[in-house]
Amino acid sequence: MQDGKVTEHKNIAVEDKYIKEFPENPKEEEYDEIIEGHDMLAMPGLVNTHTHVAMTLFRSYADDMALMDWLQNKIWPAEDHLDDDIVYWGSTLAFAEMIRGGTTAFCDMYMFMDACARAADKAGIRGNLARGLAGIGPNGQKGIDENVELYKKGTAASKS
């Protein structure tokens, strides 16, 4: 897209894993890679701005329920059984699905965020991470403390 218009029949020159330019007549020796884009689409990566990625594991669990009934009677009790390892693998599944669909970055608010960060780094996807907080409640300070720790450790954003 140039000046807000879709452009067609372009070459993409890649250098050090980054798009360098769109040359009209590329010379192979000048670039690490040239992608001939005939019958293809190149577009920026998508960003999912509200996720609870490890919840992919709850897909189709107790469908067709009212939100609060679903949360209070199904999801929140199930989340009490989550741990670092389960969140890592749930996040890994979510990232495979995101990347396959063109998502290259996400914003997640859930729990066990160190596990989510490890999975994101391994998958090569970028993310902003925070411990999810829904009101302060009885465990509010714990969630705030977890977010401060994420920030101090530098895992509030995945490194990919």
Residue map of PLM features:
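N-terminal metal-binding scaffold of metallo-dependent hydrolase/deaminase domains
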Residues: 1-30, 40-41
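Short acidic/polar active-site loop segments enriched in Thr and Asp
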Residues: 104-105, 126
